[in-house]
């Protein structure tokens, strides 16, 4: 038996294979008939039964109709983003200190860089980065005059932790927020005896020695 294929037989095999390929390529596509990742509809199990693979299961018509009616009430919902959130990247954070009256503070609006136009959830992140960089470069704390440090004695306690702290003063605090597509920096003073909290808020003096105003917050109240 001759194990070698002749040249004319090779041409016939190639022509036959090309005809078979052209037949399937020219045939109209009725739908997805194979179990592939693209043919599976994301969702719960009742919805998955309604895939094109259902025709390969026994009793295709009855099972397919029943699965579609069951899947329609299976609780699968589409997520709809409100127009307000889709346009500006989410709910705007109100400034927590705006509602308080009788307190001094300075509000600085830092506009967004026109070269950066983030959308969605990344918008607030980009705005916060811009505001943080500009705030760090703009607000530089003045060097403080060094005070003599007393000798430490074990058990003597700290003067800053006692309610009768004779050295009252203020500390400067900042709060970053974005409103209407703008980064706003709000700065104010709090007594040094007040606690440091994550939320932006005003505190009153607890030791009785902190001044009402200091050289840092005098400009917060405007001209006298």
UniProtKB/Swiss-Prot annotation:
GO terms for biological process: symbiont-mediated suppression of host cytoplasmic pattern recognition receptor signaling pathway via inhibition of MDA-5 activity; symbiont-mediated suppression of host JAK-STAT cascade via inhibition of STAT1 activity; symbiont-mediated suppression of host JAK-STAT cascade via inhibition of STAT2 activity; symbiont-mediated suppression of host type I interferon-mediated signaling pathway. It is found in: Virion; Host cytoplasm. InterPro entries: Paramyx_V_Zn-bd. Keywords: Host cytoplasm, Host-virus interaction, Inhibition of host innate immune response by virus, Inhibition of host interferon signaling pathway by virus, Inhibition of host MDA5 by virus, Inhibition of host RLR pathway by virus, Inhibition of host STAT1 by virus, Inhibition of host STAT2 by virus, Interferon antiviral system evasion, Metal-binding, Viral immunoevasion, Virion, Zinc. One of its GO terms (cellular component) is host cell cytoplasm. Residues 54-65 have a biased composition (Polar residues). Zn(2+) 2 binds at residues 193, 205, 207, 210. Zn(2+) 1 binds at residues 170, 189, 214, 217. It comes from the Viruses. GO terms for molecular function: metal ion binding; molecular adaptor activity. Residues 54-96, 150-171 are annotated as: Disordered. Plays an essential role in the inhibition of host immune response. Prevents the establishment of cellular antiviral state by blocking interferon-alpha/beta (IFN-alpha/beta) production and signaling pathway. Interacts with host IFIH1/MDA5 and DHX58/LGP2 to inhibit the transduction pathway involved in the activation of IFN-beta promoter, thus protecting the virus against cell antiviral state. Blocks the type I and II interferon signaling pathways by interacting with host STAT1, STAT2 and STAT3, and mediating their ubiquitination and subsequent proteasomal degradation. Interacts with host IFIH1/MDA5 and DHX58/LGP2. Forms with host DDB1, CUL4A, STAT1, STAT2 and STAT3 the mumps virus V-dependent complex (VDC). Belongs to the paramyxoviruses V protein family. This is Non-structural protein V. The gene is P/V/I.
């Amino acid at each position: 038996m001759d194990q070698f294929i002749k040249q004319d037989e090779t041409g016939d095999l190639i022509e036959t294979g090309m005809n078979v390929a052209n037949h399937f390529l020219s045939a109209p596509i009725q739908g997805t008939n194979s179990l592939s990742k693209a043919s599976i509809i994301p969702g719960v199990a009742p919805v998955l039964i309604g895939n094109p693979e259902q025709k390969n299961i026994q009793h295709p018509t009855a099972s397919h109709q029943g699965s579609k009616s069951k899947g329609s009430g299976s609780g699968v919902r589409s997520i709809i983003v409100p127009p307000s959130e889709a346009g500006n990247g989410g709910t705007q954070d109100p400034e927590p200190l705006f509602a308080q009256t009788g307190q001094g503070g300075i509000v600085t609006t830092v506009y967004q860089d026109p070269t950066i136009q983030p959308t969605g959830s990344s918008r607030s992140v980009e705005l916060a980065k811009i505001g943080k960089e500009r705030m760090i470069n703009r607000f530089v704390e003045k060097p403080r005059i060094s005070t003599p440090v007393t000798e430490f004695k074990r058990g003597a306690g700290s003067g800053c932790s006692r309610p009768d702290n004779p050295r009252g003063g203020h500390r400067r605090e900042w709060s970053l927020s974005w409103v209407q597509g703008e980064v706003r920096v709000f700065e104010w003073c709090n007594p040094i005896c007040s606690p440091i909290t994550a939320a932006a808020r005003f505190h009153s003096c607890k030791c009785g020695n902190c001044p009402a105003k200091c050289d840092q917050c005098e400009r917060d109240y405007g001209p006298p």
